[in-house]
Amino acid sequence: MNFKKTLLSIAIASASLTPAFSYSAPLLLDNTVHQTSQIAGANAWLEISLGQFKSNIEQFKSHIAPQTKICAVMKADAYGNGIRGLMPTILEQQIPCVAIASNAEAKLVRESGFEGELIRVRSASTSEIEQALSLDIEELIGSEQQARELASLAEKYSKTIKVHLALNDGGMGRNGIDMSTERGPKEAVAIATHPSVAVVGIMTHFPNYNAEDVRTKLKSFNQHAQWLMESAGLKREEITLHVANSYTALNVPEAQLDMVRPGGVLYGDLPTNPEYPSIVAFKTRVASLHSLPAGSTVGYDSTFTTANDAVMANLTVGYSDGYPRKMGNKAQVLINGQRANVVGVASMNTTMVDVSNIKGVLPGDEVTLFGAQKNQHISVGEMEENAEVIFPELYTIWGTSNPRFYVK
């Protein structure tokens, strides 16, 4: 049986709009579990703190100007933390706008009962946009060609499509009009005045954590946005200007403008602002214990050799679950509130740790791979240094590979 095709068939059968495959890619599986007994058979699992998520939102709100709207970025299935599980908190906090990337994510947001503004924060194909028209997504565009394609769709379905026009003032370079060129301003005006396409927002995105760089580029954006609104006859009160991600919103307050787009800060992943703790912990358990004599090798490629007689704990997690192979011989995990060294490279479904100096370890004991246990903590910095990737590359995979258990 082709498992991927089977999953796709399930998604097709469950889609509610025409065409039937509207939300089949990317496929979002509901990994939510509601009782601890449901994670008993899992290789690993995520514990997500709804209380910390709420606290992060409230703390962020306190730093935002009263007139500035918050658009919670929930792309990549809420950074791996699960849109379905977090939307009740978003609704409770009365967040007026949610940003997503895929149609599947947009569908989950709408299914939660959210009736507010829904923005896609990446360029989408015409077919993708067409298949999600009923979800009332405000699309991101940065070229006249996109505007023409959307106008054709709007005429086909007799509706107006709302768009946010991206300018490349931030220097991200992945979408947006470059207003410094001869063609750029003409193209921007053409888009803003195109029939059947309603520009409701003008935006850019800053790629660096550098306040002075942001301020320089913000000045350019403000000038270009003002010129565009005047040249295209756009009413200022009908246009949302937005440029600020998590870092910019907190560290360059003058960039908050009409709306901010916090993502990482809500989930506790903003290196410049550690006062926002992570809402997720990554956990597994001890499967068995093994005594090895001195001189024994551990793991593929025999990268570790015991110097003395040792006791090893076999953990039910590996790189297929999002615990990278590179963690071997570098990382530590928490067992019984103490640190244990990962030895040998992590396998596909197994990781070995040395528990020779930890008393009372038993099969079934809980192991913290990331997060806190008693007075110890495995930090973001540790994970990034040992895995040799940025933290989002880890937790977005954790969320798709492991069940998620939400705690208050």
From Swiss-Prot:
It comes from the Bacteria. Belongs to the alanine racemase family. Bsr subfamily. GO terms for cellular component: cytosol; periplasmic space. It comes from Vibrio vulnificus (strain CMCP6). Disulfide bonds join 71-97. The keyword Repressor does not apply. Amino-acid racemase able to utilize a broad range of substrates. Residues 1-24 form the signal peptide. This is Broad specificity amino-acid racemase. Substrate binds at residues 174, 348. The active site is at residues 75, 300. The modification N6-(pyridoxal phosphate)lysine is found at residue 75. Its cofactor is pyridoxal 5'-phosphate. It catalyses: an L-alpha-amino acid = a D-alpha-amino acid; L-lysine = D-lysine; L-arginine = D-arginine. PANTHER family: ALANINE RACEMASE (PTHR30511), ALANINE RACEMASE, CATABOLIC-RELATED (PTHR30511:SF0). Gene3D superfamilies: Alanine racemase (3.20.20.10), Lyase, Ornithine Decarboxylase, Chain A, domain 1 (2.40.37.10). The keyword Ribonucleoprotein does not apply. GO terms for molecular function: alanine racemase activity; arginine racemase activity; lysine racemase activity; pyridoxal phosphate binding. Its main location: periplasm. Keywords: Disulfide bond, Isomerase, Periplasm, Pyridoxal phosphate, Signal. The gene is alr.
